Amino acid sequence: EGDPVHREIAKALGANLYIPRLFGHGLEEAEPMLNFDNDSYWESAKEALEVAKQLGDRVILLGTSHGGALSLSLSSDPNIAALCLYGPNIAVFDPLSKLLSKPWGLQIARFAKGGNYHEMRGASDEKKNYWTAKIRLESLTHMQKFLDLTMKKSTFKKIEIPVFIGYYYKNDSLQDKVVSVPAMLKMFDQLGTPNALKFKKAFPNAGDHVITSYLSTEHYDEVTEETLRFLRKVLKG
């Protein structure tokens, strides 16, 4: 999902790149992500951060989508020098998704979907090689609960390190329709990071929720360039 932006950033900065496989992801299963749970997901993220800390003096977290929410939640670690978030999942675009973590949320989702699965629409065969295009709805209830517990002002105001946010937005019709852009911008305003150390950037030509992958957009180079411009400014020395 981050390729090639993460590789190009690491190369330009002379940095190591560590790409972890977080709990429940990247598996071939008969029932994809049926056994996903937030505790295991969180523990795998903390373990990944510990590995990253062994690879260099400072850590820059690059987080896409739900990984952006995870990065924000990890940011209290003093070894993290900056966050770069791409279409971070502060809230899902469809406001009805908040029902997922409520009583009867799973049953409502099954009724709405007509079954037990959420499927990625319009994914190419190549994209299906790297994304899990069909997942059990149970996993979405856990993901929504994670957002409920973590993506709030009390989390954001504690963050004081440099933060870059990139997202797809051109107008009300042409924008990220997987996660909420207004929720991202509200989060940005609530960060404890000084104004000089935080930057938000819309990429109107990205055309997709995933702005960092060659499989989703032809304009990923713009994302790389803006990220590097930001990091070189805020991480001098």
List each model region and its residues.
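Catalytic nucleophile-loop/oxyanion-hole region of alpha/beta-hydrolase
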Residues: 27-55
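Gly/Ala-rich beta-loop-alpha elbow adjacent to hydrolase catalytic centers
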Residues: 62-67, 71
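Active-site nucleophile loop of the alpha/beta-hydrolase fold
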Residues: 84-95
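Short, surface-exposed "cap/lid" segments of acyl-processing enzymes
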Residues: 1-14, 19-22
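Histidine-bearing beta->alpha loop at or near hydrolase active sites
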Residues: 24, 202-216
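Short beta-to-alpha linker loops that shape the active-site pocket of alpha/beta-hydrolase fold enzymes
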Residues: 21-26, 89
